[in-house]
Structures are given as structure tokens and as C-alpha cells.
Amino acid sequence: MEHQLIPFTVVLLAGGMGTRMKNLIPKQYLTIQEKPIALHSFEKLASMPEIEQMIVVCEPQYEQLFTVYKLNKPLIFARPGLRRQDSLWNGIKLIAGNPLVCIHDSARPFIEIDRIRQTVAEAEKWGAAVLGVRVKATIKICEEKQFIVNTPNRAFLWEMQTPQIVRLKLLYDGFSVAQKNELTVSDDVSLVELIDKPVKVVEGSYLNIKITTPEDLLIAQSILKNHALL
């Protein structure tokens, strides 16, 4: 059953330095199958007709990677900040009205369009939605010296992915609380949690990995070689 095409705006976060990759080139601009990782993500999103505009948060020297792609919708660039939330803030400041905002890590090139649309549909209903997968490993809470404190119930644990899709006004309201209290959040829907609004989790795919380490890069190359997985 096809989902109704709901319009939304994209903020593609492509400004991180990728220090865990131990490479001079930021991780999202390393290539897999002769194409920068960020461009895999960008092209997948750009193919969706319901997107009204795309905002790419990146350094100036990488803009040309995206401008060569012939879009039939507005493409706007914003600059990265020191933290993820600063980069997001710089991106959403360029958005007018109160659309749904689809925030995606450019280092996640294997996102599936159908799952994006499922998440958009839930965000349209609830105001905020995020892709996630059930945690498979046992997670331990440890103190500073790495001694175990307790073990949370795995049945309730989900690993968050992107896209994370939020109504623009909710993002502004969340930023207001974060900025007033000098809070740092680790993902985008945490801003919605700050204002006690619901966030719906949509079950995603374990293939929607974020390429962060050299090991991730090897896994990504393997995924691309086996197109049947996508």
C-alpha cells in the first residue's frame, strides 16, 4: 500500500570532521564505488518528488559536489557549527513556514525511500518521528572507572538512526529550552523530548548504518556490492 506523498524539507548534515575515521578527509566525503558517501545520501533524498527544498550543511569547499546535481527544487547551503545541534540550528534558520523537517546524517547512505515516507507519515500525525532499530546486544551502564552499575532491560532499548523528522515549530521550541539551559543534545528528537512532546519510533533497517569508523567503511562497501540487500 502506497503512502500519500506528504511534502517536507530536508536538512542534510554534512559538516562533521569524522575524527574516528583517522583520515584527513571527513568521513562523509570518502568514496564508496567512486562516489562520496554524502552524495549517495543526497541523491537518494533528491529523487523524492515531495521534497520542497534541500538544505545542505557543509563547508564551502564541498558545495560543488552537490551543485553539479541538477535539482528541480531549491538547494540552499548552511555552515556547520561546533556541535551537531549548532549545525542543525544553522540549517533550520533558513526555513520559512512550519513544514516537516527531515534531518539526515549524510554518512548514512543506505536509507530507503519507503522508510523515509513511513517516518514522514508518523511525523505528520505526531509532530515528530524517527527511524530506529531494536538493540540486539546487551547494554551495560558503567561508572567512570568502567565498572558496571546496572543492566537496562533490552526489551525497551532502541538505537536511533536518521532521518529524524520534526515539525519546524517543535524544533524551535526545543532549541529555546536547550539554549536557555545551555544543554547539549546527542540527536535531533532529543529537542522534542525537552518540551515533553511525543516522538514516534518507526522500525528501520540494520543496513542503515552510519559510516563512522574504518570498519564501517568496509561494511558499507560490502553492502553496495550486494544490491539485493537494498
UniProtKB/Swiss-Prot annotation:
GO terms for biological process: isopentenyl diphosphate biosynthetic process, methylerythritol 4-phosphate pathway. InterPro entries: IspD, IspD/TarI, IspD/TarI_cytidylyltransf_bact, ISPD_synthase_CS, Nucleotide-diphossugar_trans. Pfam families: IspD. Keywords: Isoprene biosynthesis, Nucleotidyltransferase, Transferase. It comes from the Bacteria. Gene3D superfamilies: Spore Coat Polysaccharide Biosynthesis Protein SpsA, Chain A. HAMAP family: IspD. Its EC number is 2.7.7.60. Signal peptide: none annotated. Pathway: Isoprenoid biosynthesis; isopentenyl diphosphate biosynthesis via DXP pathway; isopentenyl diphosphate from 1-deoxy-D-xylulose 5-phosphate: step 2/6. The keyword Nucleus does not apply. This is 2-C-methyl-D-erythritol 4-phosphate cytidylyltransferase. The record marks 20, 27 as: Transition state stabilizer. It is an enzyme of class 2 (transferase). One of its GO terms (molecular function) is 2-C-methyl-D-erythritol 4-phosphate cytidylyltransferase activity. Belongs to the IspD/TarI cytidylyltransferase family. IspD subfamily. Catalyzes the formation of 4-diphosphocytidyl-2-C-methyl-D-erythritol from CTP and 2-C-methyl-D-erythritol 4-phosphate (MEP). It comes from Protochlamydia amoebophila (strain UWE25). SUPFAM superfamilies: Nucleotide-diphospho-sugar transferases. It catalyses: 2-C-methyl-D-erythritol 4-phosphate + CTP + H(+) = 4-CDP-2-C-methyl-D-erythritol + diphosphate. The keyword Nucleotidyltransferase applies. The record marks 154, 210 as: Positions MEP for the nucleophilic attack.
